[in-house]
Amino acid sequence: MRTFTKALAAAIMVAAALTACNTSSGAGDSAEDYPSKELDWTIAFGPGGGNDIMARTMVDILKKDKLYPRDIRVENREGGSGATGWGYLFGKNGDPYAISTTSGSFITTPLEAKTGWTYQDFTPVGLLATDNAVFAVDPKSKITSWQQWVDHAKRKGKVAVGGISTVNVDFILHAMLARQAGYEIDYVPFNEEGQLQTSLLSGALDAIISNPAEVLGQLQAKKMTALLYTGNKPLAALPEVPTAVSLGYQGLPSMPRGLILPPKAPEFAQRWWIDTMKKVIATPQWKSYVEKNALTEDVRWGADFTTYLQKTSTDFERILRQHGALK
């Protein structure tokens, strides 16, 4: 497990440079005329992942339902386990026209590296849902059950497993499952879902953890085999896949899916986004997205979202230290 890769360090240096160049473009706005400008929406990971899918679903609803009256510019600013994208947003201090979605890396990346920011620096809009994961292998492995996987991993001595980000919920899940089952892992991080899946199917990885939305098509096409689902209840689209709880595994975390503004964003902008996102999550399109992607609705606005982040950060840090990912 690489706790601080050269790639992560380089991405953080780039993020710092972007932060230094950024200036607030929201000066002069008031509650009466907000929003009146183009929105700069940052996705901190590459195309095709859970963060990307959620963000683009939100943007599509905002546009279709005419909830945001100006243009929305969406940019994938991936790199450094989210450090590049959220570092960019951090540099938009006070700007009500910059926004981003969150994932587990929003909490874990600052725990691992000197990003210059933490979740506490940003203006919270809300937690909208939590996301569980699927543990999958290549069908060519001939492994069709969780017990077969555990036996294989123990025989091999150490297995190569992959996920999104260096130290994130994906790593935590891999580490907790391996420790509780009694096998060893070599964790390989990726910034993009496509690269992760390609590495599994090419034989470079023994297994991956991914969100259901990202692998459901591959699973249904029999191009991957799901061995375990980390949610407490069976996945509706894959009812035959056992849950971690049913196999005796406890305490596995979920991915927080939320929305944030830059540090010191105006209170009127925070209020506007809370009110607007309440409309977004009430739409049939959002409810369909939640159901299709096997998300768990968990809605907390403003300060309640901050309280959730505080507890989750404490839990993640404890787990990462237990598994040797943090010193």
Give the predicted meaning of each segment:
Residues A17-A20:
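C-terminal motif of bacterial Sec signal peptides marking the signal peptidase cleavage site
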Residues K158, G162-T166, D170-V241:
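Ligand-binding pocket segment of bilobal, Venus flytrap-like solute-binding proteins
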Residues E214-P284, K311-T314, I319:
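C-terminal lobe and pocket-closing loops
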Residues S36-E38, R179-Q180, I185, E267-K327:
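An extracytoplasmic/periplasmic, membrane-proximal ligand-sensing/linker region
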Residues S100-F106, A129, E192-E193, S210-V215, ...:
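Beta->alpha turn/N-cap motifs
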Residues N22-D121, Y183-D206, V299, Q322-K327:
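N-terminal (or domain-start) structured segment
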Residues Y88-Y97, L111-Q195, P256-Y289:
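Hinge/capping helix and adjacent helix->loop/strand transition within the periplasmic-binding protein
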Residues M1-A9:
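Bacterial N-terminal signal peptides that target proteins for export
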